[in-house]
Amino acid sequence: MKLAFVNPYHVKQSKEMDDNSPRKTDEKDPKTIAKLVTEGRYSFPYLPEGIYAELREAVSVRDQIVKAMNAAANRIQRWLTIYFPEYLKVYKVFDSVSGLTMLWQAPLPEDVVKLGADGIVALWHEKKLRAVGKKRAQTLIEAAKSSIGMPGGNCAKMNLHLLLEDYFTKKEQLERITAVLQEELLKVPNSEKLLAVKGIGIITVAGFLAEVGDLRRFTSPKQIQKLAGLEPKENSSGKHKGRTSISKRGRRKLRRLLFQAVLPLIRSNEDFREVYTYYSTRKDNPLKGTQAVIAVGCKLIRIFYVLLSHGADYSSTRFRADILRPGQAKAALRTTRLYSGKRPSVKMLN
């Protein structure tokens, strides 16, 4: 027997069609659901199989590890705020190798002072840390001498050791699951095409495939855009033109992943930055900050779809082609004719 899925929102919106009553009971719901099924308003849930199921499981495990690792890091920084707040002024990030070595051997300010500059340097040399020296050790000692942290004892030290052990464990687990994720990702056909795009990493591609699954079930990138909840939601009637927003339906993790991937792309990739600038500064219908980011995210979906489906290589020229407008197209035609001696087609430029 094959199971079908009826959207609960459809049931809620359809419950008044027969009796014109907002009443909702266990007797009424089955009738409403059966009516929707007879009208063909149902769908079959998609369950990824094979490599896509493995990727979804691996990405889910990685998200759990990252969440636990961040929680452990926050607890460590809380401990430092209570007992040694000056540590966070000496080290901008608490998890530097030399800093973690000090926290394990001399967690409290009095331990740092007791160890002395020579002892700290010897400890770092024992761990083969060459990027730090006596100057950093002296800075740490001065911070410890003027510390305003609460006095701590053996229990405070033990608490920090347990927190550090938890953090180290999660960090090691993160490295293991990332290695497995990379190994599984390379089994997907044409996945290396996506990794060739500047600013696109393993986590982004793996997360995209984990949420979308097999791309062969889609006939258009707009279907993936709808799955991510980035479909434009128009609100207009007659002469009234309401505000257009995104639907925010579908897989929210996919929508979050695309948003998090586009922001660094705009900063590090010249092609994406140029398209973002065009969307936000064009004369006709310029987009605001978030709107332009969403537009670039939808374009990223189309790129992923083409590269994975057709095995094509990423082309910077084709990526920027849609920002050419009639005036720019004429100039591009003249430039192309000047350097190539051939008459290019307008279709090639648009």
Residue ranges of model-derived segments:
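A detector of single, family-specific signature residues
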Residues: 1-350
